[in-house]
Amino acid sequence: MVIQLYKTYTPSTRNGTVNGQVKSTRGKNLIYGQHRCGKGRNARGIITARHRGGGHKRLYRKIDFRRNEKDIYGRIVTIEYDPNRNAYICLIHYGNGEKRYILHPRGAIIGDSIVSGTEVSIKIGNALPLTEMPLGTAIHNIEITLGKGGQLARAAGAVAKLIAKEGKSATIKLPSGEVRLISKNCSATVGQVGNVGVNQKSLGRAGAKRWLGKRPVVRGVVMNPVDHPHGGGEGRAPIGRKKPTTPWGYPALGRKSRKRNKYSEKFILRHRSK
């Protein structure tokens, strides 16, 4: 990812950055409209997820997370921007005439060939079962359930590592630091997801944040007591509690939100560190 700067005309161009390399195109039968449902409200119009709403209209790009075109070579035709995720996507033309979008692997360029199957080389962008990969392989787009498609390590810059294989399971270290077991027959894609420097991008102004569907975040200490436990007081007052809390009164710092008796607990060897 190449971060470009604007010439300074206004405060927003002074502070904002842009990536001018990647554009968006419209592939036939791969892009379609979707119902706008990301406003953070339930059926009664009550806010259930704060700080969401608005944003620019989006067309959904159908991404191939399953990589089920087995043993058919494909060629990367374009590298495109996708408004629905922070990673870039690639348009692949397969030898049988099929066209698919996949997540852009870091280091892959236009013209590269990729393939998925059981007996393919360990090359960036290739997809194959974990049982066929050597230990230490960097992977992304990892399946949890066989045939369901990749569900882990799909964000921009995400990369996991295959650290062990024993019996019917493989041990994976995820980007969060979690170490868990996955069936060896599940597939994954070799390499790291592209657009690694997405966290270095500066939006430059509040309006750019609103285009993304993000609404302002207000501190609880400046609210009224009816709206937040930190609110109230005369002038600039402290929160009035020993520790910060959420708007619903739960501890805000360090509280674990994962259910203790979740079904997947038996597959986790070490919990996340991030």
From Swiss-Prot:
InterPro entries: NA-bd_OB-fold, Rib_uL2_dom2, Ribosomal_uL2, Ribosomal_uL2_bac/org-type, Ribosomal_uL2_C, Ribosomal_uL2_CS, Ribosomal_uL2_dom3, Ribosomal_uL2_RNA-bd_dom. Residues 224-274 are annotated as: Disordered. Keywords: Chloroplast, Plastid, Ribonucleoprotein, Ribosomal protein. It comes from the Eukaryota. It is found in: Plastid, Chloroplast. One of its GO terms (cellular component) is chloroplast. Its main location: plastid. One of its GO terms (biological process) is mitochondrial translation. GO terms for molecular function: rRNA binding; structural constituent of ribosome; transferase activity. PANTHER family: LARGE RIBOSOMAL SUBUNIT PROTEIN UL2M (PTHR13691:SF5), RIBOSOMAL PROTEIN L2 (PTHR13691). HAMAP family: Ribosomal_uL2_B. Belongs to the universal ribosomal protein uL2 family. NCBIfam families: rplB_bact. Part of the 50S ribosomal subunit. This is Large ribosomal subunit protein uL2c. It comes from Ipomoea purpurea. The gene is rpl2.
